[in-house]
Amino acid sequence: MGQILLNLRYLLAPILIIVAGAGVLIGGIMAWLGVVLLFVGLIVDIATKFETTGVGYDSEGNTLGWAGFQNLTMYFMLPIFVLFQLVMAWRVYSFMAFGGAEGELVTSIFGIIPMYEGITAVNLIGATLSSGIFIGIGIIYGHELSHTKGFGFVISRIMMALSGSAH
């Protein structure tokens, strides 16, 4: 069980990125979800004062990390970033198309959270900040893949290009 938890913690950033992207997709006040998640993450980080040294090793010196799982997580982030960019592009388009109005109700998620066609200027700012924060955090995946050769390096360049940083 401990080894599972050690490896599952590497899903924290991808889950936060997906949730922030969903907030931008939903729009309205939810477009600010990424900004809120950043501060929640900072508070948790400061409160725990726990610094990780990696997954660690067993008594025989073998890593407890699942290399395949960790690599798939990094590669999985490329389609997530592409979708995040497309969602943000749609939000900018809907802002322009509806003149800064929310427009019609598209759907209601769980009967609680309304999703509108358009987006207001204030919520577009929230969407932009949320996108910038979490696509910026996502640069880590592109950076780590840039240490590889072949296919992984190509994927890293694409990821870095999506964030506007190809160092």
Say what each PLM segment does:
Residues 1-12:
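N-terminal membrane topogenic signal
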Residues 34-57, 81, 135-139:
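Central hydrophobic cores of alpha-helical transmembrane segments in multi-pass inner-membrane proteins
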Residues 49-55, 82-122, 140-144:
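Transmembrane alpha-helix boundary signature
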Residues 56-80:
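Juxtamembrane helix-capping/reentrant segments at transmembrane boundaries
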